[in-house]
Amino acid sequence: MKGYMEDREHEKSLQAEKEELKEVSVSYGHEVKLSNLFPTRFGHKNYQHTFEGMDHGRHVHAHGNKMQQLADVFFFRDALRPGSVITPTIPPTTSLPAFLPRHVADAIPFSADRFADVLAMFAPASLAMAREIRWALDTCGQRAAALLPGEKAGCATSLESLADLAASLLGTRDVRAFSAADLPTDAATTPARRGRYNVTSVRELSAMAGSGSSSSSEPAPAAVVACHDLTYPYAVFYCHSTKPTAAYAVTLVAATTGDGDGEGEAASPAKMEALAVCHLDTSRWRADNPFFVAHGVKPGEVSVCHFLTKLSIVWVPRHEQGGPRAAA
């Protein structure tokens, strides 16, 4: 996804467009101005960018502490066993704007080519809001060009289109959806959640889907679709599916009590039910991924996992749900 090095010329362009659109009002058949309907989430750091390291096809523009933060997002798959101790990084969740009805969402422009029209609908738009809107539009419109082989992706702007997209990516409408609904909802300025936790149970959501190729007796991992909420004036999700991938429901119990693991970090709940996704084939990831650099490993040598946010959704075919994972 987007790097940490901001393009100053792009910022100037956004600022110019924002100035031009301050007094613009666009009607799309609704009496109520859309900018009055939705709470905004643009006054705080967008923790979607914490997962820059998950966009494995691009160079990571980060240095020093930022590189360490990206490295901390990931962990080895072996840690997902009862009895292990883990220090998860789970980006905070504030709130998700409401989904629009499908007929309304489909009538609203949603593309980088219509960026000026989109901004006009939410005028007056701050520069931060304009940047996040543009980033979401670019993610949904241009991300396909940077997909890894075998990866599929798309964006959904309504609840109905979200279900349809997941079914399309999985190739079946008989699906199950999982989310970490019990994770806390945080204040807008809350940093990433950290803390030492005991892994007490791990349940695989994506079972092995039959046998593998004719040349191997190993089972082939089932399809998994992960959907991540984007910062936007109304609910928008970016969904993608990459094989081979495994998804887990993980119960975490605090190994220590009190505040966060470091200065300014969120207080650690005593217990969390979280979702984790593991990428089983990292051979096509960049060698400069912060996790690889921090641990001295190369692409393809290890499976890499990360936790999902409260609002992220994991979809799997209904008949492929797995069971508990054994302790080491």
Curated annotation (Swiss-Prot):
<protein>
    <recommendedName>
        <fullName>BURP domain-containing protein 11</fullName>
    </recommendedName>
</protein>
<dbReference type="InterPro" id="IPR044816">
    <property type="entry name" value="BURP"/>
</dbReference>
<feature type="domain" description="BURP">
    <location>
        <begin position="74"/>
        <end position="318"/>
    </location>
</feature>
<dbReference type="InterPro" id="IPR004873">
    <property type="entry name" value="BURP_dom"/>
</dbReference>
<dbReference type="Pfam" id="PF03181">
    <property type="entry name" value="BURP"/>
</dbReference>
